[in-house]
UniProtKB/Swiss-Prot annotation:
Cell compartment(s), UniProt: Cytoplasm
PROSITE patterns: AA_TRNA_LIGASE_II
InterPro entries: Aa-tRNA-synt_II, aa-tRNA-synth_II, aa-tRNA-synth_II/BPL/LPL, Asn-tRNA-ligase, Asp/Asn-tRNA-synth_IIb, NA-bd_OB-fold, NA-bd_OB_tRNA
Protein family according to the UniProt entry: Belongs to the class-II aminoacyl-tRNA synthetase family.
Segments passing through the bilayer: none
Species assigned in the record: Mycoplasma genitalium (strain ATCC 33530 / DSM 19775 / NCTC 10195 / G37)
E.C. code: 6.1.1.22
Catalytic class of the enzyme: ligase
Protein name: Asparagine--tRNA ligase
Sorted UniProt keywords: Aminoacyl-tRNA synthetase, ATP-binding, Cytoplasm, Ligase, Nucleotide-binding, Protein biosynthesis
BP terms from Gene Ontology: asparaginyl-tRNA aminoacylation
Classification via NCBIfam families: asnS (TIGR00457), PRK03932.1 (NF003037)
Length: 456
């Protein structure tokens, strides 16, 4: 008897008509009456389940066994596939035999009722069994695969940057310090906040590289946009400028969304029904946007100030003097209202707002930096041209009181053929949250790490 998956059965139902099959999986749902029992069986191959049925008069032994089976139990089932063209599913399994592989206890937390998001977060080890989070994590996998597909297709080299580092790449001081690193490594060691520095080094040999891995920030933030451990996509290209960077960002975002829509359409439809029917139309809007709009930081301030002054919008923060850091409310207004739900590039930020390694523009006030803003989420991606002049970089570090002892290797690269380099960091979990229509980034990662708690 052939072992098959739910995915195979649903993709080609006619192929299995009247065939005997066996399948292993978990009981997602059970409906029972006096003389008939229906099981919904999931095997992980599809977001959809296989309906299995047995009548007491046809198979009293199997009927009796299934009366005792609890939700989440693991089973092996055998039977005959019957086509059901008038039902919701194209087929069902007429049970002949059932083996109860692991009986779940009756207090299984994910019973057939509504649960809050906080309930699911407190049961992160189980929530992937719920249809919503099954969909999110399947899309996470599809999105991860698409990242590698895009970069390899475009001749980028993968750099596996270290998790342990002696550098604070962003210079913000929000790092996790490794205990006993002074005695083990003979210097203070951190969990990485970015793979950028390593990527820059490799870009000077391969020209086009990327990293994709976990990063860590010791920010005590309790917003729906922040995690202490999250994943970053960080390409770096030698001889590139801001224009090249924005084209790469736009191409990458469109490619990733297309791949999700092609390879996880069932999962997107589930999330659209669960959260918002706008999810899919929003994704289509991004794909169809020929060129993402671009505005200067100073222009963004002028737009925000005009809207605030004319009372078109009531911002919580109304100070729009040069040098203010744009808040999420400002970013969302620009994307959603002024640019009518389009992605938006904002470029040339004040150098005081950005990291020390960004190239200073000729006005000596701004840096060649870019952020990509998306509707409903705000900033999702940030990048820049890198400062290639060694003396300029040293002066910048000095003005910010950055100790360069652990950065000597990074500075030294400028001595030996470092003409130009540009790169960006794209928040993988934020992008996933946007694609899935999630309001909280904690629901986009398997086991969220946030300030104040770590339970798994």
């Amino acid at each position: 008897m052939k072992s098959v998956t739910v995915k195979q059965l649903l993709q080609t139902p006619r192929k299995f008509n009247n065939k005997q099959i066996k399948l292993s999986g978990w009981v997602k749902n059970k409906r029972a009456s006096a003389n008939i029992i229906f099981l919904a069986i999931s095997d992980g191959s599809s977001i959809n389940t296989l309906q299995a049925v047995v009548k007491q008069e046809d198979n009293p032994q199997v009927f009796s066994l299934l009366q005792t089976v609890n939700l989440a139990s693991a089973v092996m089932v055998w039977g005959e596939i019957i086509l059901t063209p008038k039902a919701k599913q194209p087929l069902e399994l007429k049970l002949k035999q059932v083996s109860l592989l692991a009986q779940a206890e009756s207090d299984y937390p994910l019973q057939k009722k509504e649960h809050s998001q906080e309930f699911f977060r407190s049961n992160a080890h189980l929530r992937v069994r719920a249809k919503t989070y099954f969909a999110v994590m399947k899309i996470r996998s599809v999105l991860s695969h698409a990242i590698f597909e895009y970069f390899f297709k475009n001749d980028f080299i993968l750099v596996q940057s270290p998790i342990l580092t002696s550098n604070d790449c962003e210079g913000a001081g929000e790092t996790f310090v490794i205990k006993d690193s002074e005695t083990f490594f003979n210097k203070t060691t951190f969990l990485t906040v970015s793979g950028q520095f390593g990527a820059e080094a490799f870009a000077q040999a391969f020209k086009k590289v990327f990293t994709f891995g976990p990063t860590f920030r010791a920010e005590k933030s309790h917003t729906n946009r922040h995690l202490s451990e999250f994943w970053m996509i960080e390409p770096e290209i030698a001889f590139a400028n801001l224009k090249d960077l924005m084209q790469l960002i736009q191409n990458l975002i469109k490619f990733l969304i297309k791949k999700v829509m092609e390879n996880a359409s069932d999962e997107l439809n589930v999330l659209a029904k669960q959260f918002s029917n706008d999810i899919i139309s929003n994704l289509k809007t991004i794909i169809s946007t020929k060129k993402f709009p671009i505005i200067e930081y100073s222009k963004a301030l002028a737009i925000l100030k005009e809207s605030s002054d004319t009372k078109k919008t009531n911002f919580e923060l109304n100070d729009f003097s040069f040098g203010i850091d744009l808040k999420t409310e400002h970013e969302r207004f620009l994307c959603e209202q002024y640019f009518q739900n389009q992605p938006l590039f904002v470029i040339n930020y004040p150098k005081e707002l950005k990291a020390f390694y960004m190239k200073t523009n000729t006005d000596n006030k701004t840096v060649a930096a870019v952020d990509l803003l998306l509707p409903k989420i705000g900033e999702i991606c940030g990048g820049s041209e890198r400062e290639s002049d060694l003396n300029q970089l040293k002066n910048r570090c000095q003005s910010l009181n950055i100790d360069t002892k652990s950065l000597n290797w990074y500075l030294d690269m400028r001595k030996w053929g470092y003409f130009a380099s540009a790169g960006f960091g794209l928040g993988f979990d934020r992008l996933l949250a946007y694609i899935c229509g999630l309001e909280n980034i904690r629901d986009a990662i398997p086991f969220p790490r946030v300030h104040g708690t770590i339970n798994f």
